[in-house]
Regions:
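C-terminal catalytic/acceptor-binding lobe
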Residues: 3-9, 141-210
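Residue-level recognition of beta-strand->loop/alpha-helix junctions
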Residues: 41-44, 95, 179
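N-proximal low-complexity "stem/linker" segments adjacent to membrane-targeting elements
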Residues: 1-46, 50
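Conserved catalytic core of nucleotide-sugar-dependent glycosyltransferases
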Residues: 56, 77-151
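Active-site nucleotide-sugar/metal-binding loop of Leloir-type enzymes
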Residues: 53-66
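Short beta-strand-to-loop acidic/aromatic patch adjacent to the donor-nucleotide binding site
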Residues: 64-75
């Protein structure tokens, strides 16, 4: 007999609004995942760590097997949830670039990768949570709050996603990144466009005088 399909909570930390491109990608994901028992969670908070913790609590009340965190400034393929589930890992996701130059890739791969490759999976020391699937059993091994900010030895702030990764690895969990999927998702940003110089004004004036 086939095992039942997992129950999945999709948690989206956000403010009062989300990007239109994200909303479209989210709708397409839900359509592609309609055979699953889904719970859609919008956790509004100006404190992202609190939003993630609230999402975990709501997922637990739903009886979810997994929680998928999606940030509201991401775009992704419709099949992303099924593809992450097929990896059968406790913590697996995709990474992406920062939205400001020099557009560094977020997360830290382990220096020593497994001797037996796992397809497109790369084992990570840390991974961002903008597109991350987590087994609910992970939270049974962690004390609350599951997500929180911290500081390093030099006083720099460590984000709630990296602190979670550190604690999960200390609890014995491995963290994986789907390298192929990471090339398919996008981090929505914003640019300001300006005229290159003021010369166009003089050119326009001369054109009017002719």
């Amino acid at each position: 007999m086939d095992s039942p399909l997992p129950r999945v909570s999709i948690a989206v930390p956000s403010g009062d609004m989300v990007h239109a491109d994200f909303a479209l990608a989210y709708a397409q994901l839900c359509m592609a995942s309609s055979k699953l028992q889904l719970q859609l969670i919008t956790v509004k908070s100006s404190i992202v760590a609190q939003a993630r913790n609230n999402g975990v609590d709501l997922a637990r009340n739903f009886g979810a097997d997994f929680i998928l965190f999606l940030d509201s400034d991401m775009v992704f393929p419709p099949t992303i949830l099924f593809r992450l589930l097929l990896h059968r890992q406790d913590i697996v996701g995709a990474t992406y670039a920062k939205r400001v130059p020099p557009f560094e890739i977020l997360g830290t791969p382990l220096a020593e990768q497994p001797t037996v490759p796992s397809g497109d999976l790369v084992e990570m020391q840390r991974i961002p949570t903008g597109c991350l699937l987590i087994s609910m059993g992970v939270f049974d091994k962690l004390s609350k709050p599951y997500f929180r900010f911290d500081t390093d030895a030099e006083g720099a702030i460590i984000g709630e996603d990296y602190v979670f990764c550190d604690r999960a690895r200390e609890a014995g969990f491995r963290i994986w990144c789907d390298a192929a999927m990471s090339r398919e998702i996008g981090h929505i940003g914003q640019n300001i466009y300006r005229l290159p110089d003021a010369g166009w004004y003089g050119t326009a004036r001369r054109g009017q005088s002719q």
